[in-house]
Amino acid sequence: MVDVNRFKSMQITLASPSKVRSWSYGEVKKPETINYRTLKPEREGLFDEVIFGPTKDWECACGKYKRIRYKGIVCDRCGVEVTRAKVRRERMGHIELKAPVSHIWYFKGIPSRMGLTLDMSPRALEEVIYFAAYVVIDPKDTPLEPKSLLTEREYREKIQEYGHGSFIAKMGAEAIQDLLKRVDLVTEIAELKEELKTATGQKRIKAVRRLDVLDAFNKSGNKPEWMILNILPVIPPDLRPMVQLDGGRFAASDLNDLYRRVINRNNRLARLLELNAPGIIVQNEKRMLQEAVDALIDNGRRGRPITGPGSRPLKSLSHMLKGKQGRFRQNLLGKRVDFSGRSVIAVGPTLKMYQCGVPREMAIELFKPFVMREIVAREFAGNVKAAKRMVERGDERIWDILEEVIKEHPVLLNRAPTLHRLGIQAFEPVLIDGKALRLHPLVCEAYNADFDGDQMAIHVPLSEEAQAEARLLMLAAEHILNPKDGKPVVTPSQDMVLGNYYLTMEDAGREGEGMIFKDKDEAVMAYRNGYVHLHSRVGIAVDSMPSKPWKDSQRHKIMVTTVGKILFNDIMPEDLPYLQEPNNANLTEGTPDKYFLEPGQNIQEVIDSLPINVPFKKKNLGNIIAETFKRFRTTETSAFLDRLKDLGYYHSTLAGLTVGIADIPVIDNKAEIIEAAHHRVEEINKAFRRGLMTDDDRYVAVTTTWREAKEALEKRLIETQDPKNPIVMMMDSGARGNISNFSQLAGMRGLMAAPNGRIMELPILSNFREGLSVLEMFFSTHGARKGMTDTALKTADSGYLTRRLVDVAQDVIIREDDCGTDRGLLIRAITDGKEVTETLEERLQGRYTRKSVKHPETGEVLIGADQLITEDMARKIVDAGVEEVTIRSVFTCATRHGVCRHCYGINLATGDAVEVGEAVGTIAAQSIGEPGTQLTMRTFHTGGVASNTDITQGLPRIQEIFEARNPKGEAVITEVKGTVIEIEEDASTRTKKVYVQGKTGMGEYVVPFTARMKVEVGDEVNRGAALTEGSIQPKHLLEVRDTLSVETYLLAEVQKVYRSQGVEIGDKHVEVMVRQMLRKVRVMDPGDTDLLPGTLMDIADFTDANKEIVISGGIPATSRPVLMGITKASLETNSFLSAASFQETTRVLTDAAIRGKKDHLLGLKENVIIGKIIPAGTGMVRYRNIEPQAINEVEVIEEAEATEEPAIIKE
């Protein structure tokens, strides 16, 4: 076998007949498979041991030679070589075809490669190949045209007319083979290149296509006649197995049936030829042979598929590769693994951040080999077999061994669907009773897991390297930040939030208010004994907490706080300020001075002068976690998170919040508000009946009235709510529910959507406390049902989007430190009309500058060129009033097959500069795809008001952008730079004309009457500026402006969609994806290069080709950039393995074979397919051969004692 990690590239070409013979170990002559009595393979049949190798290891067919010592001997009785049975997976056979047969991929694919090579239509080819017409191969001296078709009758007439042997015409694949042999590639290519200089239109397109195929044959060394098969390879028998079922029946792969048909027809044809049968019979047999081979290669591609029992189409070779169940996606890109298990998950509130609970029964099965080894090492058993028996019997001693084996051995937990890299994390196992896996509550958000019956899979990393990677890179405690936006992903939720909210509440006049304590312990003791309430404001000596960062003026004083806040601050990292107010100032700058008093001052007066603070909500906890991470990194943060979780659970239990129907308040003036709304609606309807408004206007007015009524109720609800009400506490803290849920419980449910998506005018006036009437209940069911179906559809759509995104960007890896480009991207805040979608500060964080940034007023340099912009620096730049900054960007990076560290900036998941080897493409794809399920599905219908078209939003809009489709509601853009001089309306055609006067000429643009204008007379417009509202078509923009403008536009558009749904995604992720869509150029004029006009190629390859020509003094080629949708971009990638495993497998492979494509295995996917370590992270070539140095431990200890320095183990 080939050593997987030894080869650099993989090439695919057409197989010549001699190549097929060299692979083969013998000819399969009979259609038999195995003998029904002896169940042994038949001689010369499809499973023959002589050809394919023995069925049992080291044993020939007749049994003369058994055992390994006869290795390599060929038995003299039965002719079978004594070797491993495994060779039956590798050895091929062949069938000598008695008539040439065309390969359906090359004849039937689109475009037909055979047709282009011969310049014949696929229709004509089909008539010849399937014996419906003759083709003239050599007209000799007759006036016939070469390659022209003759029917049976015409052929006979011509023979009579010109005499026998006066010209050559044949039918069948044989004729095509003769024609293909006559193709002179070099002259044809030269002729086509000449023709291209003058050709236009359809003719030019056809010439370019032909030239492409002929050039591929010429360069690859494939011969066109190899598209016709004279000899058919037979794949190894173990790849098309035949197995006996209970009851003596056999189940065989469909391929065996298909091969049998070919052999039967081939043998029959041989017999007919021997007998000199009449031409028509032979012809018919040849056609049937052709059809049999077609079915074997791609059943159902031409005509009706051959069916097996129960009229089920048989699975041919092509079907084995295609689709989700094909070889690529089912067995090469994803495999089932051993040492894995799955079970239901339950919550493990007592676990540490890096732990998970694994049931004992599960662990013993997963760690069986490790336990067995240890049993033998401790001599509890003599050999492995005995040890295995011990484990299976459940001997008492195995449990202690198991405890030791799993120490420090991380396991991976995965929850499907794995939408981003946080869907698989590593934990240290803790043995538990029961049968459910225990999961730490804080990692639920990353997994999107809950405990209502979710299941998770567990995997054991076996090798030392795998364990080290799991521990260092995948441990759950390391994954504090979300890779998509750099915000903490492990924020507490539900009970944890509620407990900390309750803990930090303040209340006036509770028992013990104004007491002063010397330290924390005294305060807690007083609280435990009931002298002081958790929410009472009390004093505490500042000096009892010496490690906190107090200001000098605050030391030796007494601070006003609550017992709850003393407990809350006790779990905080030491260097964090004492948190008194839930705001960022307190968190970053320190505790405000107003809470401190001198000893001896009247504390009650100070307390009365202070306002009551609001408690800490979910958002505040998130900010505290982010600040902690920023200051102390992962280890301290994960320890702090565990303390926060424990405190939250403990106090939410103590608080004992319950919910009853009486907790839902009654709004005192609900009846009045609704009465007023009814009155207003009546007036509107009256106005409509009098003809003062249109139906559309009436509809909008009515729905607005009800919306306002609902908002009035909501407002009243917020004004009158009691902060101690349990429901209010849950909602306010962010533990569960929001204002909309609350207003449905206590206010009114409001307007509902009808099945057609239009909002119904009749609102639901009741709330859930009063109860709904039957009609109201019926109205609300539609919305509920739509919600469910939408979610189901959205999940599939979003998953498919993620798959396409991953595919197009999987080979983008950080490949070098600095690409040294001199280009940059000028960025400013992204705005949508007046609203800011993304601020400049957010966009600057974690990027490198391209030029130095100066203060706009003083002119001082705030930050130099090529420096990393930190969070604080970004704030400083924005505060100085800078509006635009030139930064290093993925768009302008010059690295081939990837990005450099400086153009990328920081890795959002760690907060540090990105490392070489990081697979940023995959992370970008996951970051954009994972929130896809949160986007809405609907395209908004505005009820035919105030807008010319329905704007696409949510997921459909994201797909529209990434697939580079023409958008719905397209905006008209200007192609000239200048001034809008006039907008004239033409009532007859219902259009408006916009005239733009530029320096070189005048632009005239026709826009629909209903379109909303973005420009007025006198406005200055740039090329590519939108004249009307709507989405710009990116391909059109690319023609008018440059690549960078299109990239910037697409980036802004994607961000608008996500931000409008409240989803934050780092710019750099979108940049990576958009750059992949624009990485190709189309050659316009080849100049002196040997490029072909009209070919698509990578920008880097195009630049290289031009460099060579310019050096040698020739004319360089010209090209124009091409914008491709992500699906097209994936299929156009340089790696045929990656493209074939994505979509259109047969088309990709056909093309790759003709071109003799080489796959240099640069991306991740190609390497997964052939089983190499992926070239990212620790798998990069630079880390390939690192060997951990073994060190004699004794020496280290002695040296350490001698020098009294800690021992350092060398890498």
Curated annotation (Swiss-Prot):
Belongs to the RNA polymerase beta' chain family. Mg(2+) binds at residues 450, 452, 454. Pfam families: RNA_pol_Rpb1_1, RNA_pol_Rpb1_2, RNA_pol_Rpb1_3, RNA_pol_Rpb1_4, RNA_pol_Rpb1_5. GO terms for cellular component: DNA-directed RNA polymerase complex. GO terms for molecular function: DNA binding; DNA-directed RNA polymerase activity; magnesium ion binding; zinc ion binding. The gene is rpoC. This is DNA-directed RNA polymerase subunit beta'. Zn(2+) 2 binds at residues 819, 893, 900, 903.
